[in-house]
Design a protein with these regions (language model features):
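Pair of pore-lining "gating" transmembrane helices in MFS-fold secondary transporters
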Residues: 10-45, 238, 314-335, 441, ...
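Intracellular loop-helix junctions on the cytosolic face of multi-pass helical membrane proteins
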Residues: 1-15, 105-114, 143-324, 516-536
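Short amphipathic helix-loop junctions that connect adjacent transmembrane helices
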Residues: 36-52, 251-270, 328, 337-355
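Loop-to-transmembrane helix entry/capping segments in MFS-fold secondary transporters
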Residues: 50-51, 143-152, 351-355, 464-474
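A late C-terminal transmembrane helix in Major Facilitator Superfamily
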Residues: 363, 461-495
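Intracellular juxtamembrane helix-capping segments at the cytosolic ends
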Residues: 127-141, 339, 449-463
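Helix-to-loop junctions at the C-terminal end of transmembrane segments
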Residues: 65-82, 368-388, 403, 407-408, ...
């Protein structure tokens, strides 16, 4: 896709595009950590129980449904001077800054429901930002750049998570760190997001309008009216509200009746029994709400959504690819769903130690894994990279089982001396557990490689006319594991213990690899012709 740059800059356009992708990855990763592991660390320090923290991972629900409003971001242009993508970027980033500032002013213990609603709002804005960033990145990069571009995106993304996850944990350690409060951290992150909005407005290149796809019958079809788009979106929102109310008032009693005999004979606490009921009701509600929302979109003639998704689903094998997208990161997501509470509460590591190892050292290894994964993809190809990196991801979960079973001090550790780098400092030397360091190193290195290959796979499935809608749908399905396993993970960890929990996470990584083996020829053809129609 050509860049709308002055002609004298076009020889540098390819390098600049890759730089832009890394910067956008940073903007994407910052709020994700603040509604994920950083939020879990805040709740852990406030004394919230593991099962409740697991259910609060549902604040990330907007990530799984962002394809519902992605068509509006594909359809409407806010400010012609900024262009379609940059206009939405500036709006979402400014709103994120405001949302983070409000969250910092809300105590989680005293106003947990308000706190959760604000976190959902931040996740909605973050997911909306991701819709634009994913589409912008896919439009910006040529097919040959997508492997390296995916690696650079992970680089920026993980750097942001080092800041909002790792450095933030060191800041909040009262003994070894800076002794900041979590509200102070979130106010600083709000200021950074405001700065990102300024950069989006002045530094990002503007893309030229996409040309019609050759032979695309949709290219000559008039765009649906703005009225239909808005009414269609409102119809989908109404369906989701109906689904929520039905889950609350109908499916919860049904779940109680179904699980009652088993729960009465169990040794689980009353609170944990209630969580199992909530979990079953949640799954039933999801099975009801998604078809209802699809029906509402069709009845309301939400054509921008239906055409974008129809273009993808009209291709042979599309449903199988979606199943693979859900499964590929499932085991990794299950193991990592409550990793921060596991390390802080179950293993009793200090905030500074977790911040240094899991978020700083570990994320640098993830960056190395992402860059190594991008380079290996040039030689391995997409299918072999997905298979190899998927096997490594599954194997890395065994390390957490070992850590939970053996406990602290199983391997010799090391001492991190005190330092002051201005942005972050340690007031005294901090011991680092050797077992923790080894497990985090393996997990982050393999996870970075797997993420790079997975992003390249997602970009290969989209068609440019519907980039935002299709990529939002695909990445939303990819986030199903990360968001939806949280409630199950919290309940399961308290029910069967952490060692068995991590064995389950390893087993959950295997179905995707079997499916990938069955799809070998299809993925290889997709790698040869990115963006081409899928085949059986």
């Amino acid at each position: 896709m050509p860049l709308a740059l002055p002609i004298t800059q076009r020889p540098l356009a390819g390098t600049y595009a890759l730089f832009v992708v890394a910067v956008l990855g940073f903007a994407s990763g910052l709020p994700l950590a603040l509604t994920g592991q950083a939020l879990q660390a805040w709740l852990s320090t406030e004394g919230v129980d593991i099962a409740t923290i697991g259910f609060l991972s549902l604040v990330g629900l907007p990530y799984t449904f962002k394809f519902l409003w992605a068509p509006l971001m594909d359809r409407f242009e806010l400010w012609p001077a900024l262009g379609r993508r940059r206009g939405w970027l500036v709006l979402t980033q400014l709103a994120l800054a405001g949302g983070l500032w409000l969250l910092a002013a809300t105590p989680p213990r005293g106003a947990l429901q308000v706190f959760a609603l604000l976190a959902v709002g931040i996740a909605f804005l973050s997911a909306s930002q991701d819709v634009v960033i994913d589409a912008y990145r896919t439009d910006l990069l040529a097919p040959a750049q997508r492997g390296l571009g995916a690696s650079l995106n992970v680089l920026g993304y993980r750097l942001a998570m080092i800041l909002s996850g790792g450095v933030a944990l060191i800041w909040t350690d009262a003994v070894q760190g800076s002794g900041w409060s979590w509200p102070q951290v979130y106010r600083l992150m709000a200021a950074i997001m405001a700065g990102a909005a300024v950069l989006s407005a002045v530094a990002l290149p503007r893309l030229l309008p996409p040309p019609p796809l050759p032979g695309d019958g949709l290219a000559s079809t008039p765009l649906p009216s703005a009225r239909n788009d808005l009414l269609g979106f409102l119809a989908v929102v109404a369906a989701v509200v109906v689904g929520y109310l039905t889950t609350l008032h109908a499916f919860t009693p049904v779940a109680q009746a179904l699980l009652g005999p088993w729960l009465r004979g169990s040794t689980l606490s009353a609170a944990l029994q209630s969580r199992w009921v909530d979990l079953l009701a949640l799954l039933m509600g999801l099975a009801f709400t998604l078809p209802l929302a699809a029906w509402a979109a069709r009845r309301a003639r939400f054509e921008t959504l239906l055409r974008g998704l129809g273009s993808y689903f009209s291709q042979p094998g599309a449903a199988v690819f979606l199943l693979f997208i859900v499964l590929y990161k499932l085991g990794d997501a299950f193991a990592g769903a409550l990793l921060t509470p596991f390390l802080l509460k179950a293993m009793a590591f200090s905030s500074a130690e977790v911040g240094l190892v899991n978020k700083v050292i570990g994320l640098w290894l993830t960056l190395g894994g992402a860059l190594l994964g991008g380079l290996l993809m040039l030689r391995l190809g997409l299918w072999r990279a997905l298979m190899l990196f998927g096997l490594l991801q599954a194997a890395s979960n065994i390390g957490f089982w070992w850590l939970a079973a053996q406990g602290k001090g199983s391997l010799p550790g090391l001492m991190i001396p005190a330092f002051d780098w201005g942005v972050v400092s340690l007031t005294q030397a901090t011991p680092v557990d050797g077992g923790l360091l080894m497990v985090i190193a393996v997990e982050n290195l393999s996870g970075g490689m797997g993420t790079a290959a997975f992003l390249a796979f997602l970009m290969s499935l989209t068609q440019q006319r519907f980039t935002a809608t299709q990529f939002a749908m695909l990445s939303a399905f990819a986030s199903v594991g990360r968001v939806w396993v949280g409630p199950l993970a919290g309940v399961l960890a308290e029910s069967i213990g952490w060692p068995r929990f991590f064995i389950v996470s390893t087993v959950l990584a295997l179905p995707a690899l079997g499916l990938l083996w069955a799809m070998r020829s299809t993925v290889q053809r997709l790698d040869a012709t990115p963006g081409a129609p899928l085949d059986d």
